[in-house]
Amino acid sequence: MSKNVIHRSFANLYHRLTRGNFGTEKWKKQFAYFGEGTRVDWPANINVGGGTLHFGDKTHILSGSRIANFVEGGKITIGDGCFIGYGFSLLNASEVTIGNHVLFASQVLITSENHGIDPESELSYMAQPLVSSPVHIGDGCWIGEKVCILPGVTIGKKCIIGAASVVTKDVPDYCIAAGNPARVIKKYNFETHNWEKV
């Protein structure tokens, strides 16, 4: 039997025994709020840092997630009833707010921070101070696979972001956006009850 088969068998057994929820009790003590019925599947890397984490009720985060506050006072809020797919990354040096009932496909990246990029500085880009701006995602959105949401972006409620999009600008309520950089391609018309091209 190969090492990979043994590893997968052990991982599957461990997942069943722990219900994929390893470490949740430890994390709960660090949270500003950890909602009823909320679940974080193992393995996960969660770093409260010097900030706060608030996870709403009945939210499920699949395995491979990385959620981190990098600065004192950083604030991460994830609402009620969210489903977050495998390999989710949320990197915060400001504030990230995710509304209620938001659906994330796998390997989504949300970041409110970036390294300074002053080429005249004596410091390398890695050593330059972080530049940050809040990110907000409205209620009921659907964020596609491998989407990147960059600092300063607000996505309105009930929006859909197409797979592999890079969101650099705000997306209004009830819109579909896609591409790199993402642009609005459709908006819902409540009079015709249809998604219409923009």
Language-model-derived ranges and their functions:
Residues 117-121:
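Short acidic/His/Gly/Ser-rich catalytic and metal-binding motifs that mark active-site loops
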Residues 1-111, 138-139, 157, 173, ...:
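Domain-scale signature associated with acetyltransferase and cell-envelope carbohydrate enzymes
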Residues 109-111, 115-116, 130:
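Extended, non-globular alpha-helical segments
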Residues 91-93, 97, 145-160, 165-168:
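Beta-rich strand-turn-strand
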